[in-house]
């Protein structure tokens, strides 16, 4: 249990069976009445943000999350198989459990998996990854002057918008948080 007075940004708590991360908190002492803590909570499972007010000193169940560094080894019948780099145990996750990041996974990639009570809550990919362009329209000389973009399909099947001068076979850096092109990889 944790007191609402001890909330800090990043603290994880459990309310009604759901795990929430404290995004913002403000301890308020009104001139009249008792003190309270106003918080902004983000659901770890789906990313929803809600505002909730707690009485000062109110006890809340703290959620202790476990973070494991796992390596993606292969895909078998729709499940992504990961290996724990310390215990060498295998963990199988569906694309639903991984979320939108599944389109960036390739063999050998290391990810952080967050567990709560032995259930997967979240899969954290690296912020930027380098992937090969496998399909895109050919670039024409002089295209860079307009500053436009075109769709490109990467080796994992993900689609991102890239500048017109990018061609098939080039290695590019991609931001996994918002699917944006970051630059060429040398």
Swiss-Prot record:
Coiled coil: none annotated. Pathway: Protein biosynthesis; polypeptide chain elongation. Pfam families: EFP (PF01132), EFP_N (PF08207), Elong-fact-P_C (PF09285). The keyword Protein biosynthesis applies. SMART domains: EFP, Elong-fact-P_C. GO terms for molecular function: translation elongation factor activity. This is Elongation factor P. It comes from Prochlorococcus marinus (strain MIT 9515).
């Amino acid at each position: 249990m944790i007191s609402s007075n001890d909330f800090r940004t990043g603290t994880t708590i459990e309310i009604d069976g759901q795990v929430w991360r404290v995004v913002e908190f403000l301890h308020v002492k009104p001139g009249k009445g008792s003190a309270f803590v106003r918080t902004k909570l983000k659901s770890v499972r789906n990313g929803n943000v809600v505002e909730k007010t707690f009485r000062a000193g109110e006890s809340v169940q703290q959620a202790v999350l476990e973070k494991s560094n796992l390596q993606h080894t292969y895909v078998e019948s729709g499940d992504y198989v990961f290996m724990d780099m310390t215990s060498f145990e295998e963990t199988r996750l569906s694309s639903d459990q991984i979320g939108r990041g599944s389109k960036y996974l390739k063999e050998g990639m290391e990810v952080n998996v967050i567990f709560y009570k032995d259930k997967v809550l979240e899969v954290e990919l690296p912020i930027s990854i380098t992937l090969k362009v496998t399909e895109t329209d050919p670039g024409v000389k002089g295209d860079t002057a307009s500053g436009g973009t075109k769709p490109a399909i990467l080796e994992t099947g993900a689609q991102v918008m890239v500048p017109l001068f990018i061609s098939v076979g080039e290695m590019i850096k991609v931001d996994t948080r918002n699917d944006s092109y970051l630059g060429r990889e040398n």
